[in-house]
Amino acid sequence: MWNSMEEMHVLLKNRGKINPRSSQEYADRGGFEALKKALSMDSEAIIDVIRASGLRGRGGAGFPTYRKMEFTAHASDPTRYIVCNADEGEPGTNKDRILLSTDPCAVFEGMAIAGKAVGAHTGYIYLRAEYTYLFPVLKDALEDAEKRGFLGKNMMESGFDFEIKFRSGAGAYVCGEETALFESIEGKRGEPRFRPPFPSIHGLFGKPTMLNNVETLANIAPILLNGAEWYRSIGTANSPGTKLFTVCGNVVRRGVFEFPMGVNLKDIIYEVCGGIADGKGLLGVQTGGTSGAIINADQIDMTLDIDTVSASGGRLGCGTILVIDDSNCIVDIVRNNLDFFRGESCGKCTPCREGGQQLYNLVTRISRGLATLPDLEKIDELTETMRLTALCGLGHSTAVPVQTSIQNFRKEYLAHIDRDYCPVCAQAAVAEGIYEAEEDYRNDGNSRMGRRRAAVGERDVMYDSYDAYARHRSRGASYAGRFERRGGREA
Protein backbone atom coordinates (compact mmCIF):
# COMPACT_ATOMS: atom_id res chain seq x y z
CA MET A 1 0.00 0.00 0.00
CA TRP A 2 1.43 3.36 -1.04
CA ASN A 3 1.95 5.96 1.68
CA SER A 4 0.79 9.32 0.31
CA MET A 5 3.80 11.03 1.92
CA GLU A 6 6.32 8.80 0.16
CA GLU A 7 7.48 8.83 -3.42
CA MET A 8 6.60 6.03 -5.82
CA HIS A 9 9.46 5.43 -8.22
CA VAL A 10 8.44 4.04 -11.58
CA LEU A 11 10.42 6.40 -13.81
CA LEU A 12 13.12 7.23 -11.27
CA LYS A 13 13.78 3.66 -10.14
CA ASN A 14 17.29 3.66 -11.65
CA ARG A 15 18.33 7.12 -10.48
CA GLY A 16 21.65 6.78 -8.68
CA LYS A 17 21.64 2.99 -9.05
CA ILE A 18 23.17 2.49 -12.50
CA ASN A 19 25.87 4.01 -14.64
CA PRO A 20 23.77 5.97 -17.17
CA ARG A 21 26.35 5.25 -19.88
CA SER A 22 25.97 1.48 -19.48
CA SER A 23 23.12 -0.20 -21.35
CA GLN A 24 24.07 -3.49 -19.71
CA GLU A 25 23.47 -2.14 -16.21
CA TYR A 26 20.11 -0.87 -17.43
CA ALA A 27 19.33 -4.31 -18.87
CA ASP A 28 20.37 -6.01 -15.62
CA ARG A 29 17.58 -4.12 -13.85
CA GLY A 30 14.89 -5.21 -16.31
CA GLY A 31 15.67 -2.80 -19.09
CA PHE A 32 14.83 -3.65 -22.73
CA GLU A 33 12.49 -6.47 -21.64
CA ALA A 34 9.52 -4.37 -22.73
CA LEU A 35 11.17 -3.68 -26.09
CA LYS A 36 11.83 -7.40 -26.55
CA LYS A 37 8.15 -8.01 -25.90
CA ALA A 38 7.09 -5.25 -28.30
CA LEU A 39 9.24 -6.65 -31.11
CA SER A 40 7.14 -9.82 -31.02
CA MET A 41 3.85 -7.86 -31.19
CA ASP A 42 2.13 -6.19 -34.11
CA SER A 43 1.44 -2.47 -34.24
CA GLU A 44 -2.22 -2.63 -33.23
CA ALA A 45 -1.47 -4.81 -30.21
CA ILE A 46 1.02 -2.28 -28.85
CA ILE A 47 -1.38 0.61 -29.44
CA ASP A 48 -4.17 -1.34 -27.71
CA VAL A 49 -2.04 -1.68 -24.56
CA ILE A 50 -1.25 2.04 -24.51
CA ARG A 51 -4.93 2.82 -25.09
CA ALA A 52 -6.02 0.58 -22.23
CA SER A 53 -3.41 2.12 -19.91
CA GLY A 54 -4.88 5.61 -20.25
CA LEU A 55 -1.42 7.21 -20.64
CA ARG A 56 -1.69 10.93 -21.34
CA GLY A 57 1.00 13.40 -22.39
CA ARG A 58 3.26 14.59 -19.58
CA GLY A 59 4.49 17.80 -21.15
CA GLY A 60 1.48 19.89 -22.12
CA ALA A 61 -2.27 19.46 -22.41
CA GLY A 62 -2.46 15.79 -21.45
CA PHE A 63 -3.44 14.48 -24.91
CA PRO A 64 -3.99 10.67 -24.97
CA THR A 65 -0.77 9.06 -26.15
CA TYR A 66 -2.45 6.21 -27.99
CA ARG A 67 -4.21 8.67 -30.29
CA LYS A 68 -0.89 10.10 -31.50
CA MET A 69 0.29 6.54 -32.07
CA GLU A 70 -2.89 5.62 -33.90
CA PHE A 71 -2.96 8.67 -36.17
CA THR A 72 0.70 8.25 -37.12
CA ALA A 73 0.45 4.49 -37.66
CA HIS A 74 -2.53 4.91 -39.98
CA ALA A 75 -0.96 7.67 -42.08
CA SER A 76 -0.67 6.87 -45.79
CA ASP A 77 3.02 7.85 -46.09
CA PRO A 78 5.23 4.86 -45.17
CA THR A 79 8.14 7.07 -43.99
CA ARG A 80 7.46 8.06 -40.39
CA TYR A 81 9.39 9.54 -37.48
CA ILE A 82 9.45 9.48 -33.69
CA VAL A 83 10.56 12.74 -32.06
CA CYS A 84 11.44 13.14 -28.38
CA ASN A 85 10.88 16.69 -27.19
CA ALA A 86 13.71 17.33 -24.72
CA ASP A 87 13.56 21.10 -25.18
CA GLU A 88 12.80 21.62 -21.49
CA GLY A 89 12.70 25.41 -21.59
CA GLU A 90 10.13 26.10 -18.87
CA PRO A 91 11.92 28.09 -16.13
CA GLY A 92 12.43 26.06 -12.97
CA THR A 93 11.74 22.68 -14.63
CA ASN A 94 14.29 19.86 -14.34
CA LYS A 95 12.42 16.57 -14.67
CA ASP A 96 13.52 15.75 -18.23
CA ARG A 97 17.11 16.59 -17.39
CA ILE A 98 16.98 14.14 -14.48
CA LEU A 99 15.63 11.35 -16.69
CA LEU A 100 18.13 11.92 -19.49
CA SER A 101 21.13 12.27 -17.21
CA THR A 102 20.40 9.30 -14.94
CA ASP A 103 18.48 6.80 -17.11
CA PRO A 104 18.75 7.66 -20.83
CA CYS A 105 18.16 4.08 -21.97
CA ALA A 106 14.62 4.24 -20.54
CA VAL A 107 13.87 7.05 -22.99
CA PHE A 108 15.59 5.21 -25.86
CA GLU A 109 13.52 2.10 -25.13
CA GLY A 110 10.28 4.07 -25.11
CA MET A 111 11.17 5.64 -28.46
CA ALA A 112 11.99 2.26 -30.00
CA ILE A 113 8.69 0.76 -28.81
CA ALA A 114 6.83 3.76 -30.22
CA GLY A 115 8.73 3.27 -33.48
CA LYS A 116 7.58 -0.35 -33.67
CA ALA A 117 4.00 0.74 -32.94
CA VAL A 118 3.80 3.35 -35.70
CA GLY A 119 6.18 1.80 -38.23
CA ALA A 120 8.96 4.38 -37.83
CA HIS A 121 12.61 3.46 -38.23
CA THR A 122 14.19 6.78 -37.23
CA GLY A 123 13.85 8.84 -34.08
CA TYR A 124 15.20 12.24 -33.07
CA ILE A 125 15.93 13.58 -29.61
CA TYR A 126 15.75 17.37 -29.67
CA LEU A 127 17.79 18.64 -26.72
CA ARG A 128 17.57 22.18 -25.42
CA ALA A 129 20.69 24.28 -25.97
CA GLU A 130 21.40 24.54 -22.25
CA TYR A 131 21.51 20.73 -21.95
CA THR A 132 24.19 20.10 -24.56
CA TYR A 133 26.55 19.04 -21.77
CA LEU A 134 24.43 15.86 -21.66
CA PHE A 135 25.44 14.86 -25.19
CA PRO A 136 28.47 12.77 -24.08
CA VAL A 137 26.31 10.73 -21.68
CA LEU A 138 23.54 10.24 -24.23
CA LYS A 139 25.89 9.31 -27.06
CA ASP A 140 27.87 6.88 -24.92
CA ALA A 141 24.67 5.19 -23.71
CA LEU A 142 23.29 4.92 -27.24
CA GLU A 143 26.53 3.59 -28.72
CA ASP A 144 26.76 1.01 -25.93
CA ALA A 145 23.17 -0.11 -26.52
CA GLU A 146 23.76 -0.40 -30.27
CA LYS A 147 27.00 -2.32 -29.75
CA ARG A 148 25.21 -4.83 -27.53
CA GLY A 149 22.36 -5.21 -30.02
CA PHE A 150 19.64 -3.67 -27.86
CA LEU A 151 19.05 -0.80 -30.30
CA GLY A 152 19.92 0.15 -33.86
CA LYS A 153 19.89 -2.26 -36.80
CA ASN A 154 18.20 -5.62 -36.38
CA MET A 155 17.38 -4.97 -32.72
CA MET A 156 17.68 -8.16 -30.67
CA GLU A 157 17.79 -10.09 -33.97
CA SER A 158 14.16 -9.16 -34.64
CA GLY A 159 14.71 -7.81 -38.13
CA PHE A 160 13.42 -4.37 -37.05
CA ASP A 161 15.72 -1.34 -37.34
CA PHE A 162 15.43 1.82 -35.27
CA GLU A 163 18.05 4.56 -35.42
CA ILE A 164 18.17 7.43 -32.90
CA LYS A 165 19.72 10.79 -33.80
CA PHE A 166 20.42 13.86 -31.68
CA ARG A 167 19.72 17.48 -32.50
CA SER A 168 20.10 20.60 -30.37
CA GLY A 169 18.24 23.87 -30.33
CA ALA A 170 19.71 27.35 -30.02
CA GLY A 171 17.96 28.35 -26.80
CA ALA A 172 14.58 29.52 -28.13
CA TYR A 173 11.72 28.74 -25.73
CA VAL A 174 9.22 28.66 -28.60
CA CYS A 175 10.96 25.59 -30.06
CA GLY A 176 9.28 23.56 -27.34
CA GLU A 177 6.15 23.92 -29.51
CA GLU A 178 6.05 20.82 -31.69
CA THR A 179 5.93 22.40 -35.15
CA ALA A 180 8.56 25.02 -34.27
CA LEU A 181 10.71 22.13 -33.08
CA PHE A 182 10.32 20.46 -36.49
CA GLU A 183 11.37 23.67 -38.21
CA SER A 184 14.47 23.85 -36.02
CA ILE A 185 15.50 20.25 -36.74
CA GLU A 186 15.09 20.96 -40.45
CA GLY A 187 17.54 23.85 -40.14
CA LYS A 188 14.95 26.58 -40.45
CA ARG A 189 13.98 29.41 -38.15
CA GLY A 190 12.11 28.05 -35.12
CA GLU A 191 8.59 29.30 -35.77
CA PRO A 192 5.28 27.45 -35.34
CA ARG A 193 3.44 26.22 -38.40
CA PHE A 194 -0.20 26.75 -39.19
CA ARG A 195 -2.35 23.73 -38.42
CA PRO A 196 -3.91 21.67 -39.97
CA PRO A 197 -2.20 19.61 -41.27
CA PHE A 198 -1.21 18.10 -37.94
CA PRO A 199 2.13 16.38 -37.21
CA SER A 200 0.67 12.88 -37.45
CA ILE A 201 0.05 13.63 -41.14
CA HIS A 202 2.61 16.30 -42.01
CA GLY A 203 5.34 16.56 -39.38
CA LEU A 204 9.12 16.39 -39.52
CA PHE A 205 10.39 16.72 -43.13
CA GLY A 206 6.74 16.68 -44.20
CA LYS A 207 6.30 13.09 -42.99
CA PRO A 208 3.93 11.56 -40.40
CA THR A 209 5.51 12.15 -36.99
CA MET A 210 4.74 11.13 -33.42
CA LEU A 211 6.19 13.68 -31.02
CA ASN A 212 6.17 13.19 -27.27
CA ASN A 213 7.79 14.59 -24.17
CA VAL A 214 10.72 12.79 -22.50
CA GLU A 215 8.59 11.76 -19.53
CA THR A 216 5.77 10.44 -21.72
CA LEU A 217 8.14 8.22 -23.69
CA ALA A 218 9.76 6.94 -20.49
CA ASN A 219 6.32 5.65 -19.39
CA ILE A 220 5.86 3.39 -22.41
CA ALA A 221 8.25 0.57 -21.42
CA PRO A 222 6.88 0.10 -17.86
CA ILE A 223 3.33 -0.02 -19.26
CA LEU A 224 4.13 -2.64 -21.87
CA LEU A 225 6.16 -4.72 -19.41
CA ASN A 226 3.70 -4.66 -16.49
CA GLY A 227 0.41 -4.27 -18.34
CA ALA A 228 -2.31 -1.66 -18.63
CA GLU A 229 -4.17 -2.89 -15.54
CA TRP A 230 -1.08 -2.40 -13.37
CA TYR A 231 -0.64 1.12 -14.72
CA ARG A 232 -4.28 2.03 -14.11
CA SER A 233 -3.95 0.91 -10.50
CA ILE A 234 -1.68 3.95 -9.97
CA GLY A 235 -2.99 7.51 -9.95
CA THR A 236 -6.58 8.52 -10.74
CA ALA A 237 -9.19 7.13 -13.11
CA ASN A 238 -8.69 9.85 -15.73
CA SER A 239 -4.98 10.45 -15.07
CA PRO A 240 -3.33 7.07 -14.42
CA GLY A 241 0.31 6.57 -13.55
CA THR A 242 2.91 8.66 -11.79
CA LYS A 243 4.03 12.22 -12.44
CA LEU A 244 7.38 13.92 -12.01
CA PHE A 245 7.14 17.20 -10.09
CA THR A 246 9.85 19.83 -9.92
CA VAL A 247 9.33 21.76 -6.68
CA CYS A 248 11.13 25.10 -6.55
CA GLY A 249 10.82 28.47 -4.89
CA ASN A 250 10.48 29.25 -1.19
CA VAL A 251 10.39 25.76 0.33
CA VAL A 252 12.84 24.02 2.64
CA ARG A 253 13.47 21.04 0.36
CA ARG A 254 13.53 21.54 -3.39
CA GLY A 255 13.99 18.94 -6.11
CA VAL A 256 12.38 16.52 -8.55
CA PHE A 257 9.92 14.07 -6.98
CA GLU A 258 7.78 11.25 -8.39
CA PHE A 259 4.26 10.72 -7.05
CA PRO A 260 1.11 9.04 -8.33
CA MET A 261 -1.28 11.36 -10.12
CA GLY A 262 -3.78 12.76 -7.64
CA VAL A 263 -1.29 13.56 -4.89
CA ASN A 264 -2.31 16.51 -2.73
CA LEU A 265 -0.48 19.78 -3.41
CA LYS A 266 -0.60 20.82 0.24
CA ASP A 267 1.00 17.52 1.27
CA ILE A 268 3.86 18.03 -1.19
CA ILE A 269 4.58 21.50 0.15
CA TYR A 270 4.34 20.80 3.87
CA GLU A 271 4.95 17.07 4.33
CA VAL A 272 7.46 16.30 1.59
CA CYS A 273 9.22 19.63 1.11
CA GLY A 274 9.24 20.73 4.75
CA GLY A 275 7.03 23.80 4.42
CA ILE A 276 7.92 27.40 3.67
CA ALA A 277 11.58 28.34 4.04
CA ASP A 278 12.81 30.76 6.73
CA GLY A 279 9.59 30.50 8.72
CA LYS A 280 7.66 32.76 6.34
CA GLY A 281 4.04 32.46 5.31
CA LEU A 282 2.67 31.10 2.05
CA LEU A 283 1.40 33.64 -0.47
CA GLY A 284 0.60 31.40 -3.43
CA VAL A 285 1.67 28.62 -5.77
CA GLN A 286 2.16 28.50 -9.52
CA THR A 287 1.57 25.05 -11.02
CA GLY A 288 2.69 23.93 -14.46
CA GLY A 289 5.60 26.31 -14.91
CA THR A 290 5.76 29.97 -15.90
CA SER A 291 2.72 29.53 -18.12
CA GLY A 292 0.67 27.91 -15.34
CA ALA A 293 -2.07 29.18 -13.08
CA ILE A 294 -1.23 31.10 -9.91
CA ILE A 295 -3.41 30.14 -6.95
CA ASN A 296 -3.54 31.61 -3.46
CA ALA A 297 -2.76 29.97 -0.13
CA ASP A 298 -6.41 29.05 0.49
CA GLN A 299 -6.57 26.97 -2.70
CA ILE A 300 -3.64 24.59 -2.23
CA ASP A 301 -5.66 21.74 -0.71
CA MET A 302 -6.16 20.24 -4.17
CA THR A 303 -5.26 17.05 -6.00
CA LEU A 304 -2.67 17.27 -8.75
CA ASP A 305 -3.97 15.52 -11.83
CA ILE A 306 -4.52 16.75 -15.37
CA ASP A 307 -8.26 17.41 -15.14
CA THR A 308 -8.34 18.95 -11.65
CA VAL A 309 -5.60 21.45 -12.44
CA SER A 310 -7.28 22.30 -15.76
CA ALA A 311 -10.51 23.00 -13.90
CA SER A 312 -8.64 25.55 -11.76
CA GLY A 313 -7.80 27.54 -14.88
CA GLY A 314 -4.29 26.21 -15.44
CA ARG A 315 -2.58 23.05 -16.57
CA LEU A 316 -0.46 20.40 -14.91
CA GLY A 317 1.88 20.46 -17.91
CA CYS A 318 5.51 19.97 -17.01
CA GLY A 319 4.67 19.48 -13.33
CA THR A 320 6.63 22.42 -11.97
CA ILE A 321 5.44 23.73 -8.60
CA LEU A 322 6.68 27.22 -7.78
CA VAL A 323 6.07 28.02 -4.10
CA ILE A 324 5.80 31.75 -3.37
CA ASP A 325 6.19 33.08 0.17
CA ASP A 326 4.68 36.27 1.55
CA SER A 327 7.85 38.30 1.07
CA ASN A 328 7.06 38.43 -2.66
CA CYS A 329 4.76 40.75 -4.57
CA ILE A 330 2.43 38.78 -6.83
CA VAL A 331 2.13 41.66 -9.31
CA ASP A 332 5.90 41.79 -9.69
CA ILE A 333 6.07 38.02 -10.20
CA VAL A 334 3.52 38.23 -13.01
CA ARG A 335 5.44 41.13 -14.54
CA ASN A 336 8.61 39.01 -14.54
CA ASN A 337 6.70 36.17 -16.21
CA LEU A 338 5.50 38.53 -18.93
CA ASP A 339 9.00 39.88 -19.41
CA PHE A 340 10.10 36.32 -20.14
CA PHE A 341 7.25 35.64 -22.57
CA ARG A 342 7.61 38.86 -24.55
CA GLY A 343 11.30 38.10 -25.05
CA GLU A 344 10.64 34.51 -26.15
CA SER A 345 7.89 35.25 -28.68
CA CYS A 346 9.06 34.34 -32.18
CA GLY A 347 7.13 37.32 -33.56
CA LYS A 348 5.33 35.38 -36.29
CA CYS A 349 1.78 36.13 -35.14
CA THR A 350 0.52 39.55 -34.09
CA PRO A 351 -1.52 38.46 -31.02
CA CYS A 352 1.56 37.02 -29.31
CA ARG A 353 4.13 39.54 -30.57
CA GLU A 354 2.12 42.66 -29.77
CA GLY A 355 -0.16 41.23 -27.10
CA GLY A 356 2.71 40.03 -24.94
CA GLN A 357 4.35 43.44 -25.05
CA GLN A 358 1.10 45.24 -24.27
CA LEU A 359 0.38 42.93 -21.34
CA TYR A 360 3.85 43.61 -19.98
CA ASN A 361 3.30 47.37 -20.32
CA LEU A 362 -0.06 47.24 -18.54
CA VAL A 363 1.17 45.10 -15.63
CA THR A 364 4.25 47.32 -15.32
CA ARG A 365 1.96 50.34 -15.00
CA ILE A 366 0.08 48.52 -12.25
CA SER A 367 3.28 47.58 -10.41
CA ARG A 368 4.38 51.23 -10.42
CA GLY A 369 1.07 52.55 -9.15
CA LEU A 370 0.25 54.36 -12.39
CA ALA A 371 -2.78 52.33 -13.53
CA THR A 372 -6.53 52.75 -13.19
CA LEU A 373 -9.37 50.24 -13.02
CA PRO A 374 -9.98 50.39 -16.80
CA ASP A 375 -6.49 48.93 -17.21
CA LEU A 376 -7.73 45.70 -15.60
CA GLU A 377 -10.51 45.62 -18.18
CA LYS A 378 -7.94 46.09 -20.95
CA ILE A 379 -5.93 43.19 -19.57
CA ASP A 380 -9.00 40.97 -19.52
CA GLU A 381 -9.85 41.84 -23.13
CA LEU A 382 -6.26 41.41 -24.29
CA THR A 383 -5.71 38.04 -22.62
CA GLU A 384 -8.93 36.68 -24.09
CA THR A 385 -7.92 37.88 -27.56
CA MET A 386 -4.53 36.17 -27.23
CA ARG A 387 -6.12 32.96 -26.01
CA LEU A 388 -8.45 32.80 -28.99
CA THR A 389 -6.23 34.04 -31.81
CA ALA A 390 -2.54 33.29 -31.10
CA LEU A 391 -0.90 30.85 -33.50
CA CYS A 392 0.59 28.51 -30.90
CA GLY A 393 0.56 27.60 -27.23
CA LEU A 394 3.04 30.31 -26.26
CA GLY A 395 0.52 33.05 -27.02
CA HIS A 396 -2.32 31.07 -25.49
CA SER A 397 -0.51 30.32 -22.24
CA THR A 398 0.92 33.82 -21.74
CA ALA A 399 -2.53 34.87 -20.61
CA VAL A 400 -2.94 32.14 -17.97
CA PRO A 401 -0.78 33.52 -15.11
CA VAL A 402 -2.19 37.00 -15.68
CA GLN A 403 -5.84 35.94 -15.67
CA THR A 404 -5.53 33.58 -12.71
CA SER A 405 -3.45 35.99 -10.61
CA ILE A 406 -6.00 38.77 -11.09
CA GLN A 407 -8.78 36.35 -10.20
CA ASN A 408 -7.06 34.97 -7.09
CA PHE A 409 -5.13 38.07 -5.94
CA ARG A 410 -7.46 40.89 -6.92
CA LYS A 411 -6.89 42.71 -3.63
CA GLU A 412 -3.18 42.97 -4.37
CA TYR A 413 -3.82 44.38 -7.83
CA LEU A 414 -6.29 46.92 -6.47
CA ALA A 415 -3.78 47.98 -3.83
CA HIS A 416 -1.30 48.83 -6.56
CA ILE A 417 -3.88 50.52 -8.76
CA ASP A 418 -5.02 52.71 -5.88
CA ARG A 419 -1.37 53.55 -5.16
CA ASP A 420 -2.28 52.81 -1.59
CA TYR A 421 0.07 50.31 0.07
CA CYS A 422 1.71 47.10 -1.11
CA PRO A 423 3.09 45.39 2.02
CA VAL A 424 6.03 44.01 0.05
CA CYS A 425 7.28 46.38 -2.59
CA ALA A 426 5.49 49.63 -1.56
CA GLN A 427 5.20 50.42 -5.26
CA ALA A 428 1.68 51.68 -4.69
CA ALA A 429 3.11 54.76 -3.01
CA VAL A 430 6.24 55.00 -5.15
CA ALA A 431 6.32 55.79 -8.85
CA GLU A 432 9.70 55.16 -10.44
CA GLY A 433 11.39 55.41 -7.04
CA ILE A 434 10.22 58.97 -6.28
CA TYR A 435 8.54 59.66 -2.91
CA GLU A 436 5.99 62.44 -3.11
CA ALA A 437 4.82 64.54 -0.17
CA GLU A 438 1.33 63.55 0.94
CA GLU A 439 -0.32 66.90 0.25
CA ASP A 440 1.18 67.06 -3.26
CA TYR A 441 0.42 63.41 -3.85
CA ARG A 442 -3.27 63.87 -3.10
CA ASN A 443 -4.12 67.49 -3.85
CA ASP A 444 -1.69 69.12 -6.26
CA GLY A 445 -3.39 69.54 -9.63
CA ASN A 446 -0.07 69.04 -11.38
CA SER A 447 0.74 65.74 -9.67
CA ARG A 448 -0.14 62.38 -11.21
CA MET A 449 -2.66 61.65 -8.48
CA GLY A 450 -4.06 65.13 -8.67
CA ARG A 451 -4.62 64.82 -12.41
CA ARG A 452 -6.20 61.42 -11.98
CA ARG A 453 -8.49 62.68 -9.21
CA ALA A 454 -9.56 65.55 -11.40
CA ALA A 455 -10.40 63.10 -14.18
CA VAL A 456 -12.19 60.39 -12.18
CA GLY A 457 -13.35 62.18 -9.05
CA GLU A 458 -12.75 61.19 -5.45
CA ARG A 459 -10.82 57.96 -5.01
CA ASP A 460 -13.53 56.30 -2.93
CA VAL A 461 -16.02 56.69 -5.76
CA MET A 462 -13.87 54.40 -7.89
CA TYR A 463 -14.39 51.53 -5.47
CA ASP A 464 -18.04 51.72 -4.50
CA SER A 465 -18.55 48.25 -5.98
CA TYR A 466 -15.67 46.75 -4.04
CA ASP A 467 -16.94 46.71 -0.49
CA ALA A 468 -14.29 44.31 0.75
CA TYR A 469 -11.55 46.41 -0.72
CA ALA A 470 -13.08 49.60 0.67
CA ARG A 471 -12.64 48.09 4.13
CA HIS A 472 -9.10 47.02 3.28
CA ARG A 473 -8.07 50.52 2.20
CA SER A 474 -9.30 52.34 5.32
CA ARG A 475 -7.13 55.26 6.34
CA GLY A 476 -5.49 53.33 9.15
CA ALA A 477 -4.29 50.58 6.80
CA SER A 478 -3.24 52.80 3.92
CA TYR A 479 0.20 54.12 3.13
CA ALA A 480 -1.27 57.63 3.30
CA GLY A 481 -2.62 57.06 6.80
CA ARG A 482 0.67 55.64 8.06
CA PHE A 483 2.49 58.55 6.37
CA GLU A 484 0.35 61.06 8.29
CA ARG A 485 0.68 59.27 11.64
CA ARG A 486 4.46 59.47 11.30
CA GLY A 487 4.35 63.21 10.77
CA GLY A 488 5.16 63.02 7.07
CA ARG A 489 8.07 60.59 7.43
CA GLU A 490 8.47 57.62 5.11
CA ALA A 491 6.65 54.47 6.29
Tell where the protein language model's regions lie, with residue ranges:
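Cofactor-/ligand-binding subdomain signature composed of acidic, glycine-rich
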Residues: 1-49
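Gly-rich Lys/Arg/Thr-decorated short loops/hinges at beta-loop-alpha junctions or inter-strand turns
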Residues: 26-32, 84-96, 199-204, 246-251
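Ferredoxin-type iron-sulfur electron-transfer modules in oxidoreductases and energy-metabolism complexes
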Residues: 33-49, 78-79, 86, 95-100, ...
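Conserved phosphate/anionic-ligand binding catalytic regions in large, soluble enzymes, centered on
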Residues: 52-71, 169-183, 187-188, 342-355, ...
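Short acidic, glycine/serine/threonine-rich loops at helix termini
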Residues: 61-62, 66-69, 93-96, 135-140, ...
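Histidine-anchored nucleotide/phosphate-binding helix
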Residues: 103-117
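Short amphipathic, charge-patterned alpha-helical segments
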Residues: 110-114, 261-277
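Hydrophobic alpha-helical positions that pack around
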Residues: 135-261, 273
